[in-house]
Amino acid sequence: GSPNAVGVMQFMAEAGTPMLAPVGTTAVVLPMDEKRRWVFKTTQNDALISDALIAHMVKHGVRTVGFIGFNDPYGENWYTVFSAQAQKAGIRIVASERFLRSDGSVAGQVAKLMAAKPDAVLVAAAGGPTVLPHTTLVDTGYKGRIYQTHGAAAPDFLRLGGAKVEGTVLAASLMLVLPEVAD
């Protein structure tokens, strides 16, 4: 993910070896410099996905959002991008929480989110760990809409989350459903 790609950029540049980075953060390609010229990002920028999520929020009357994301560059970049775009759209972030990829519980963070009574919650995580805050919100009775980043667009999210993640809103690449797209 993002932390790994950022961590090896210097080594790839020194070796003159191109690196394919399946990450959302633009930090691996911007600002362009000698080490970033070796990185080729394969997924959409977080800003593009954030814009789509915010458009959906606006369309559905969301005025307040709780944010919970990884306590690493992925989560921090998402908070930076999303908070700026949300503010422009008139959406207020009423709670902001972080968690580690290895956490076994986010009960404390979810309690703080619930106390803020947001219209919706955005989970900024990737892979299997996207399920933990989502299912914890559901288990504690949260009734608002739950949004996920394109980091949740993976089979593990559905497999691990099961029925508790039904109704999730996320934006992702057509590559995920390419066989279903008409020619």
Task: Place the predicted regions along the sequence by residue.
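Short, ordered loop/turn segments at secondary-structure junctions
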Residues: 1-2, 24-25, 70, 151
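Extracellular/periplasmic Venus flytrap/periplasmic-binding protein
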Residues: 26-28, 36-141, 159, 177-183
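Extracytoplasmic "Venus flytrap"/periplasmic binding protein-like
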Residues: 4-21, 32-34, 135-145
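Rossmann-fold dehydrogenase core element
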Residues: 38-41, 163-175
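Short beta->alpha connector loops
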Residues: 1-3, 46-47, 127-128, 152-153
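Hydrophobic/aromatic residues located in beta-strands of well-ordered beta-sheets
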Residues: 19, 39, 65, 146-147
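A structural micro-motif
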Residues: 17, 37, 91-92, 144-145, ...
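Venus flytrap/periplasmic-binding-protein-like
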Residues: 20, 26-27, 101, 143-165
